[in-house]
């Protein structure tokens, strides 16, 4: 997987790291109208830089999105095999790690997995979770007879990877509690409260801590 006729270093050569705040990585497929969900997520997250991750087949769609992003730095990237989960996952990690090297914190990297193959979306999601990215989103809505989201009905569904980490920690805290390891349980419950603001998860952590 590589950038379009350039390297990551060349793409970012004249971009001032000190001004960077948020980056958005979008999977790009070949369907009709797929540019709208991508542009919607750009409007929502207001990133300084957008990575359009697609395939050779979706190059035309990528160019269509680029044409509408005049004031945003855009980097093009291509999956070598959009149906190979292992390769897509490794290439997704590479995108995130390159952004990290260029000054972005993982928590300031967001992903839109609406378009592209299911494998591409899954790979980007797994990469986002493994690196603790800010959040990843999916643009849903009412669909027409061809299965495409009808313009004007879009709604953005988001999930923060930190919520997944918090749920895992909460499960471990319960395990420690059941084994009378109260000190370890208390530490994990405190970490859970620092990871997420999800009311249900926080309340469970506080309850376990209270009876600990």
Where are these regions (language model features)?
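Long, low-complexity, Lys/Arg-enriched
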Residues: 1-110, 122-212
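Intrinsically disordered, low-complexity N-terminal tails
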Residues: 113-115
